[in-house]
Amino acid sequence: MSLSTEKKAAIVAEFGRDAKDTGSSEVQIALLTAQINHLQAHFSTHKKDHHGRRGLLRMVSRRRKLLDYLKRTDLAKYSEIIARLGLRR
């Protein structure tokens, strides 16, 4: 249920400031979005996986908090990442 190492590396390369930038808010938001999208596909077939759904809600909450932080600190990066990820905030 987790992302592969190659997929994570591609996301870090696309959204990070350099190849080893894994801690910036932009990268964390992009990784959480990829994981959330992966889990949404899982829940379309496994409707009664309530334990996994709880983890999904936790990830969504964490992403929302990171997006709020980014909006508060750097509005331009917030707008850019919303557009690049296709989020509807």
From Swiss-Prot:
Ranges that cross the membrane: none
GO molecular function, one term: structural constituent of ribosome
SMART domains cross-referenced by the UniProt entry: Ribosomal_S15 (SM01387)
Pfam families xrefs: Ribosomal_S15
Keyword field: Ribonucleoprotein, Ribosomal protein, RNA-binding, rRNA-binding
GO biological process: translation
GO CC annotation: cytosolic small ribosomal subunit
Record's function text: One of the primary rRNA binding proteins, it binds directly to 16S rRNA where it helps nucleate assembly of the platform of the 30S subunit by binding and bridging several RNA helices of the 16S rRNA.
Complexes and interactors: Part of the 30S ribosomal subunit. Forms a bridge to the 50S subunit in the 70S ribosome, contacting the 23S rRNA.
Similarity-based family: Belongs to the universal ribosomal protein uS15 family.
Protein name according to UniProt: Small ribosomal subunit protein uS15
Organism annotation: Histophilus somni (strain 2336) (Haemophilus somnus)
Gene: rpsO
